[in-house]
């Protein structure tokens, strides 16, 4: 099971110190911090609450409120890539991995559509990515990103503690490119 993943933890030692990007470099995040989303994400801002990770009464937000470790996240991503593995029914996984909104969604830029599970690659050439059509990806505002590529039989989890770089900055792209370069030999 996913023994280290929940919507809160009782042990602050389980948490990394959160940071956010600034032109001067990463800055330590504080309670109530408002940070503008990158322009490519249609603007707006995020109100951060690092303390929510220690609050069992906080709203259980899957987009900005889960805590967990790399092993658990990889186990979940692998289950999605390989058809459910007893965590989800295969029909549910098929829905998560199907394009419900086409490339017009462009949540990750050109070439990306959207399924129930996140951004779904519908045109690798337009996206300028080494990933294959059918790759599913998503991330979280506190600085994580993950993707799986069913054709390459590959799952990748990137856990950082820096918003928004770890979610949608150059770092996840550099990791992606390094992984695919290594696969090419």
Regions flagged by a language model, labelled:
Residues 146, 153-161:
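Short, well-ordered beta-strand elements
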Residues 1-130:
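Short, surface-exposed loop or secondary-structure junction motifs
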Residues 163-184:
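Generic C-terminus detector
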Residues 117, 145-147:
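Short, surface-exposed charged micro-motifs
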Residues 137, 147-149:
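Well-ordered beta-strand positions
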Residues 140-142:
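Short, small/polar residue-rich loop motifs at catalytic or cofactor-binding pockets
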Residues 11, 150-152:
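Short acidic-glycine loop/turn motifs at beta-strand connectors
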Residues 130-136:
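Short, hydrophobic/aromatic-rich segments at coil-to-beta transitions
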């Amino acid at each position: 099971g996913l023994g280290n993943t929940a919507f809160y933890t009782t042990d602050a030692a389980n948490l990394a110190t959160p940071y956010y990007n600034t032109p001067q470099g990463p800055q330590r995040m504080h309670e109530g911090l408002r940070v503008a989303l990158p322009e490519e994400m249609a603007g707006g801002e995020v109100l951060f609450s690092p303390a929510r990770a220690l609050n069992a009464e906080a709203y259980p937000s899957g987009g900005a409120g889960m805590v967990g470790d790399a092993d658990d996240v990889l186990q979940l991503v692998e289950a999605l890539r390989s058809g459910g593995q007893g965590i989800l029914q295969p029909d549910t996984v098929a829905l998560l991995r199907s394009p419900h909104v086409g490339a017009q969604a462009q949540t990750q830029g050109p070439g990306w559509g959207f399924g129930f599970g996140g951004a779904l690659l519908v045109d690798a050439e337009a996206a300028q990515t080494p990933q294959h059509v059918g790759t599913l990806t998503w991330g979280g505002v506190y600085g994580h990103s993950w993707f799986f590529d069913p054709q390459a039989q590959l799952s990748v989890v990137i856990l950082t503690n820096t918003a928004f770089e770890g979610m949608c900055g150059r770092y996840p792209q550099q990791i992606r490119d390094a992984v695919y370069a290594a696969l090419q030999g």
